[in-house]
Amino acid sequence: MQVTFLGTSSGVPTRARNVSAVALRLPQRAELWLFDCGEGTQHQFLRSDLRLSQLRRVFVSHMHGDHVFGLPGLLASLGLSGNSNGVDLYGPDPLESYLQGVLRNSSTRIGYPLKVHRVRDAAEQNLIVFEDKDILVRCTPLTHRVPAYAYRVEQKPKPGHFNLERAQSLGIPPGPVYAALKRGEQVSLDDGRVVDGRDFCGPDRPGASIVFCTDTVFSEAAVSLAAGADLLIHEATFAHSEAEMAYQKQHSTSTMAAQTAAEAGVGKLVLTHLSPRYAPGNPVTPNDLLREAQAIFSNTILAKDFLSFEVAPRCNSS
């Protein structure tokens, strides 16, 4: 999985940072997933190496404008391109009526299947939001001024490495049989033997896990959702000195994000959703927020627009 930050500012864009959007590229399935879609996100796509035509799913944290104002235009542009097989959207209850209203009142025809999934029940009941043979997605309610949700994306474990030499030594013929054994399945051979793929594969290889957490003040629910994740993307709207304002506005400080990462035992923390007040040259800068967080959780980095990197399970990392 590859993460690309398309917007890392809170509230309004700045010259250096657009508002919230994070892309998750899944190369093995030629898909792109998007987490939030602030105004101008489709322009950020044009400045990146991402392909909008690969967009398959959009996960919306909450309905504040800096997280959703870019969505109607992006979906409309995807429709004009004529090469989408459909998009599934996941988010708060008002998401569907918001999109329907904008598209209807602007006489916009999408031209491809568009389905909206409400996540409130899944979040409150700890149910799975999305699952297929490779990936599952969970979510949890956050603490914000409007209903907001954090999302966790997990790759399912894959069978361990196949012991080819052992299969050959037992006279198992190559071909489709090997493919089934690699999947850990039981196979009946032509000579009557039944072999179990699990006997030919090493331990399962864990998949990577990513948590997207915004907007919220410090939340125990977020700690639970992020437990053991390889990557936590967490809002850090305010510096520690603005903790009182953070509580009032129900946003996180840099230290709240770091506390979440530390308590959850994640592999890496990325700070995003930074207030424009912390622009370089001001009394407090983004690097100050980074230092505050690193004092609590050392493996913390600062997001910037177009930052992109691969996310791998920690046990497979160098």
UniProtKB/Swiss-Prot annotation:
InterPro entries with a match to the protein in the record: Metallo-B-lactamas (IPR001279), RibonucZ/Hydroxyglut_hydro (IPR036866), RNase_Z/BN (IPR013471)
Entry keyword set: Endonuclease, Hydrolase, Metal-binding, Nuclease, tRNA processing, Zinc
GO MF, any single term: zinc ion binding
Top EC group: hydrolase
UniProt EC number: 3.1.26.11
Active site residues according to the UniProt entry: D66
Binding positions for Zn(2+) 1 per the UniProt entry: H62, H64, H144, D215
Pfam families per the UniProt record, alphabetical: Lactamase_B_2
Residues bound to Zn(2+) 2: D66, H67, D215, H273
Alphabetized CDD domains for the sequence: RNaseZ_ZiPD-like_MBL-fold
Leader sequence residues: none
Enzymatic reactions: Endonucleolytic cleavage of RNA, removing extra 3' nucleotides from tRNA precursor, generating 3' termini of tRNAs. A 3'-hydroxy group is left at the tRNA terminus and a 5'-phosphoryl group is left at the trailer molecule
Cofactor note as given: Binds 2 Zn(2+) ions.
Cofactor: Zn(2+)
Highest taxon listed in the record's lineage: Bacteria
Classification via HAMAP family: RNase_Z_BN
Cited function: Zinc phosphodiesterase, which displays some tRNA 3'-processing endonuclease activity. Probably involved in tRNA maturation, by removing a 3'-trailer from precursor tRNA.
Quaternary assembly: Homodimer.
Family: Belongs to the RNase Z family.
Protein name according to UniProt: Ribonuclease Z
Natural source organism: Prochlorococcus marinus (strain MIT 9313)
